Amino acid sequence: MSKTPSYEDATACQAALFEWAESYDLKDWNRLSKCIAPTLQIDYRAVFGQFWEAMPADEFVGMISSPGFLGNPLIKTQHFVGMTRWTQTSEDSVTGRHQMRVAHQKYADAQMKEVVLKGHGHGGATTWFRKVDGDWKFAGIEPEIRWAEFDLDKIFAE
């Protein structure tokens, strides 16, 4: 099965995608935990060379919210999602293909006045969604960085 999902299913997946992006940018880990599937496929090979075929939700939230990643209070992000193409791959699975721009800034201290690093990724992402107990949940991501501005590779380096 490979078809365009119904309007209702596509907008429900879009809502889950919005919650995912907003939770990252607002560092709202409780919000993140509510919009994700119990297990996720995380293909971060383009980001830091790692792939997880079936990462449990609590491990995913722990990784994302860690001080070495988005949990660093000195790092601000905006995960901007552009145009999307949706494909329904089964009754309870939808794949999204998105244009993406992800901006990152790292600040010198908690006053958030002096930017010490900038790094912005441009490209796309494939995302997966799974229907869980009647609700569409974010179930994974594979970013594709086509090009970067500034020092994206240094944002999460210690």
From Swiss-Prot:
Catalytic residues (positions): 79, 104
Protein role: Scytalone dehydratase-like protein; part of the ergochrome gene cluster responsible for the typical purple-black color of the ergot sclerotia. The ergochrome gene cluster produces several ergot pigments including the yellow ergochrome secalonic acid and its derivatives, as well as the red anthraquinones endocrocin and clavorubin. The pathway begins with the synthesis of atrochrysone thioester by the polyketide synthase (PKS) CPUR_05437. The atrochrysone carboxyl ACP thioesterase CPUR_05436 then breaks the thioester bond and releases the atrochrysone carboxylic acid from CPUR_05437.
GO molecular function terms listed in the Swiss-Prot or TrEMBL record: scytalone dehydratase activity
Family as reported in the entry's similarity comment: Belongs to the scytalone dehydratase family.
Induction or repression: Expression correlates with the formation of the sclerotia and thus the pigment production and is directly regulated by the cluster-specific activator CPUR_05433.
GO biological process: melanin metabolic process
Annotated keywords: Lyase
EC category: lyase
Pathway: Pigment biosynthesis
Binding-site positions, substrate: 24, 44
Pfam families reported for this sequence: Scytalone_dh
InterPro entries, per the entry: NTF2-like_dom_sf (IPR032710), Scytalone_dehydratase (IPR004235), Scytalone_dh (IPR049884)
UniProt entry tagged with the keyword Lyase: yes
EC number assigned by the record: 4.2.1.-
Protein name: Scytalone dehydratase-like protein CPUR_05428
